[in-house]
């Protein structure tokens, strides 16, 4: 029994799409992993959709004004013709209309390959209909990634351009629609689908190893250019598919066009009608190859019993003399070779072909030839056999060519060293892989870097395609001699493994997760998918902590270079850390520190970098990702500062972004107003002025948060001065002691000065009521019980003192301890005394201590206890059952996303949420950190300076899809 290979696809963004074969009114589901309480996760309640061949004819009344023109395109023999069709309206009297049929989904494909972002989804049904969807985009605006929009539909013979937002079936009007079950095989069904990457290169982390000369782990990362067929910038996307009948469909869209196009051609000459009718392919694979703009097509025909190879070449027809003239691409098929199957193995056992898998090789490989894996079932045994081949151009020696063609211009005196590459190809056989169990599925992971075999006993083994060694045994077979040792290519290298999974007969589909840190499984008798995190059996041995932490850190970096969201790795790491914490809490904290230290090293980030470098680090994406992981792993503990330090850094980054962005946009608005000053009747002038002052208005909640935060830090200083042994209020050690947090606070104070200066220099006089936003912002900042100037001087002096200290002794270990745990190492105990004493002299002595101490600093939301409801703020099930819990096991009143988080403040804008904002269905939640926000939505009139119909874009628009922690935002149901 072979498992379905493409019935599920996990996007880089974190959205999981899978086939629904059981519902009476839906055939595809969307879900994602969602953090419930910072510790436990769940699969978000799946949204069910129905995709049927007539979907392009449906028009929802409420969104008809935003739909694009409906057109059709037909393709015959490589030519493309377009025509306009009408759009019938289905949705009114559904009871009187004939039923519409929908079919089982045969394959699902996110655009995850290479540099693609993972936001488009191709869904194929068993008849061969293909529906193209996009996430995070409505016809009129950007939206969150869990929202689907159809962009076109291909019903085998025609392509229908029709942009339409899709609704889950539970939000549709009743329809006369039913699933049509069919046992018939269709020669138009799609066997293989492949996305084509863009022309962008990617960074690939190949491995890390322990360098004994420096006593650290070093990683090797390399930039890899695109290979195979990749589309130029004037193409928005491109993809292709092979059908059972050998038909190749090639879809694409120009960047400056709304229309989607299709080119069709046949794999073989089908002039013979009888041959055309009987041609059935059982397997087909499309693989990038290193010939310029070429893909390798591998097929196996039931009729011929041959494996055949073809080269597909795409010419994008770029006009060098007229680059603005865009021509349709042209496709050409070239037959390479064909070979028969081996009937028996070396011992005479009959072989039965089970699967065909082709692994691509990038241009940086020593041998970039694609590798063909032919999987056989060895009959009358329990074994499987994988035969490995390389398809490579034939290499001819000069000596041979001299004999074959004496007239060739070859240096006969040096002919032994000359090798010539033929236009022909040959199959080179490599060593076979004998597997002691029956294989039910083969998949590739990490851009073909690994190949996983799924066995009928519920186990999975992953091999590195560079050396074909079992990844979980990589360290066991390594020599510990030499400069480099402990070579790690993935978390599996350190011994993390998938364990035993449900047996295939009970499984609808299963797949190794994107970061290779777990397996997602859907069983027939289960309502939701399940996730089995990779586990390390030998977690009790402290000596293994360093290599386990390094392996997880390297896996995280490897995933981020591939733009993978990596929540599967987070869950595996948290599971491992919690298992350690049950044995030794202190050891678990050190494990997190070791992991994060490796992350900084692999990203080449130094926590004590010079100011000019630190200014770039604090706004970088790698730091954001490091802080996300620190936040997620730190939430394993209560009463610790690991998670709080990460939240503080992320909040400070957000505040800095807000003030910096407003300062720049305010300058731009002033220039616009100045240019239009002579046009007093210009209707856009008021809009520009309003937008300018609305920018300032948007800073007021952020300014309030920052004032409250500085006050909170000073409160902690006061408490520690009076009780230096107090362990509850030591977060301030990390914030004042770590260079990164000091740099962020100083940068914010600098941006605040810029904003206040520009507001004072350019008061709004044309419409005085609008100037109230400037007045109120200055009032908020001036009411701080802590003098900002004194506070800034204090931080600058601390910086100088620490720089002098660094010259005397290394500072990396101190910085890591402060930045991760907010703890001062014992050998640096005098640092804590200095911070308290100097803060007392430089800050508190100039402030009203009573006013500071009794100031309200609630609502800062820098700890998990302020984010999640207390009813669920604990480990919700025994760790042995995993960190992912079924929604049905949660308390009844805590089964919705809204019930997980405290809905008091917008965690991006720092503004207090109104009752209407909470209940209007536009509130978003972060799937990773649990933040709630309305960022990216239209600002309600009661949140602007004066009520107006003007819709402005504020700085939080950047967080329409992604949270300040970089986690995915989704809309919570009202």
Curated annotation (Swiss-Prot):
The keyword Nucleotide-binding appears for this protein: no
Q: Where is this motif: Nuclear localization signal?
A: 889-893
Naming one, the record's GO cellular component terms include: core mediator complex
Q: How does it assemble?
A: Component of the Mediator complex, which is composed of at least 21 subunits that form three structurally distinct submodules. The Mediator head module contains MED6, MED8, MED11, SRB4/MED17, SRB5/MED18, ROX3/MED19, SRB2/MED20 and SRB6/MED22, the middle module contains MED1, MED4, NUT1/MED5, MED7, CSE2/MED9, NUT2/MED10, SRB7/MED21 and SOH1/MED31, and the tail module contains MED2, PGD1/MED3, RGR1/MED14, GAL11/MED15 and SIN4/MED16. The head and the middle modules interact directly with RNA polymerase II, whereas the elongated tail module interacts with gene-specific regulatory proteins.
Q: How is it modified after translation?
A: Phosphorylated by KIN28.
Region Disordered, annotated ranges: 62-92
Q: Where in the cell is it found?
A: Nucleus
Please describe what this protein does: Component of the Mediator complex, a coactivator involved in the regulated transcription of nearly all RNA polymerase II-dependent genes. Mediator functions as a bridge to convey information from gene-specific regulatory proteins to the basal RNA polymerase II transcription machinery. The Mediator complex, having a compact conformation in its free form, is recruited to promoters by direct interactions with regulatory proteins and serves for the assembly of a functional preinitiation complex with RNA polymerase II and the general transcription factors.
Additional info?
Answer: Present with 1720 molecules/cell in log phase SD medium.
Has UniProt tagged this entry with the keyword Cytoplasm? Answer: no
Leader sequence range is: none
Q: Name one GO molecular function term.
A: RNA polymerase II-specific DNA-binding transcription factor binding
Between which residues do disulfide bridges form? none
Q: Which residues cross the membrane?
A: none
An annotated GO BP = positive regulation of transcription initiation by RNA polymerase II
Which spans does this entry mark as compositional bias, Low complexity? 63-75
| Alphabetical UniProt keywords | Activator, Nucleus, Phosphoprotein, Transcription, Transcription regulation
Q: What is this protein called?
A: Mediator of RNA polymerase II transcription subunit 16
- Organism of origin is Saccharomyces cerevisiae (strain ATCC 204508 / S288c) (Baker's yeast)
What family does this chain come from, according to its entry?
Belongs to the Mediator complex subunit 16 family.
Q: What is the lineage of its organism?
A: Eukaryota, Fungi, Dikarya, Ascomycota, Saccharomycotina
| Biased composition range(s): Polar residues | 76-92
